[in-house]
Amino acid sequence: MIISASTDYRAAAQRKLPPFLFHYIDGGAYAEYTLRRNVEDLSAIALRQRVLKNMSELSLETRLFDETLAMPVALAPVGLTGMYARRGEVQAARAAAAKGVPFTLSTVSVCPIEEVAPAIDRPMWFQLYVLKDRGFMRNALERAKAAGVTTLVFTVDMPVPGARYRDAHSGMSGPYAAPRRILQAMTHPAWAWDVGLLGKPHDLGNISTYRGNPTGLEDYIGWLGANFDPSISWKDLEWIREFWNGPMVIKGILDPEDAKDAVKFGADGIVVSNHGGRQLDGVLSSARALPAIADAVKGELAILADSGIRTGLDVVRMIALGADSVLLGRAFVYALAAAGEAGVRNLLELIEKEMRVAMVLTGAKSIGEISADSLVRELGA
């Protein structure tokens, strides 16, 4: 299959993966309205073309949390990344490091912190949930510190699991899920050999290390689901703010008032996110939520955004709407599933090329020059 655009990787991943894995990363909550709007709302934003601006000197480099990024992009935390390629978190982290952008390891990764951190030559980020088992949280934070993690990304929009109906149809969950997954793996021999057999162990590395015994998909659905904490409040995060002496980012902000609360709390950054449309269906797309949040807190902390970003044009749109940087989730997992580390590297190169074209043709010579003026004000807006 020919890969000529960043969006080509989705079809390539679908061909290679067992359905339960493809639909797990591809799907969203309930009827998936928000999942679709994330992409549609962002792609509908018109860029303002400018010409004859002498764009011979152009830089995508930016600074974020005292790090220099080759472009305003980081790889988002995605659970079970190690099921999409052999030791997938390690491969994705290497690709990100090679392209000069951060990789964020998920709490529910296949590869543990201690396996991923030594594999790259730049500090990585780590994502954590608020769970009822505070012992696990403290253990994960201590291990992240010991591994040299610089930035903590704290996900706050999962006090309860989202209802992902597609998972029951695909075999990730629902009746006879385990035998259905086995049958699907048998019909995808390339994945079964490379990931299913050679990619073992398939347990949740960070959780297994804490519990002292192997964990798997049933634990992902069971133990983790039982440990989400609906009683979470800002007060529950105070001990973490005191414990963690590096940058702390609150992920899952969609309302300006919550963004203001993050400033009061002392967060170093927020991620404007609806969890890729995987939690509450019917909420605002990130693209629609971002401008009001930027108006409320821009300059008081770093603003990152995710959900719906598939191309370099989308990155430029999000920056113009008020983000300082973005997180790529599904996009990099599709590339990882299709072609491993090389696929993620190529995706990031395509994103960079698409950004360069967009910046040249909107007259922005640096990331700092991308602004609301880079967008067309639609009639009636």
Swiss-Prot record:
Entry GO terms, CC: plasma membrane
Name of the protein: L-lactate dehydrogenase
Cofactor needs: FMN
Any Pfam family matching the protein: FMN_dh
Entry's Gene Ontology molecular function annotations: FMN binding; L-lactate dehydrogenase activity
Function (record text): Catalyzes the conversion of L-lactate to pyruvate. Is coupled to the respiratory chain.
SUPFAM superfamilies: FMN-linked oxidoreductases
Record's subunit section: Homotetramer.
Catalytic activity reported: (S)-lactate + A = pyruvate + AH2
Assigned EC number: 1.1.-.-
Positions with a binding annotation for substrate: Y24, Y129, R164, R278
UniProtKB keywords: Cell inner membrane, Cell membrane, Flavoprotein, FMN, Membrane, Oxidoreductase
Subcellular locations according to the entry: Cell inner membrane
Residue span, FMN hydroxy acid dehydrogenase domain: 1-380
Family to which this protein belongs: Belongs to the FMN-dependent alpha-hydroxy acid dehydrogenase family.
Binding, FMN: 106, 127, 155, 251, 306-330
Membrane topology: Peripheral membrane protein
One Gene Ontology term from the biological process aspect of the record: lactate metabolic process
Gene that produces this protein: lldD
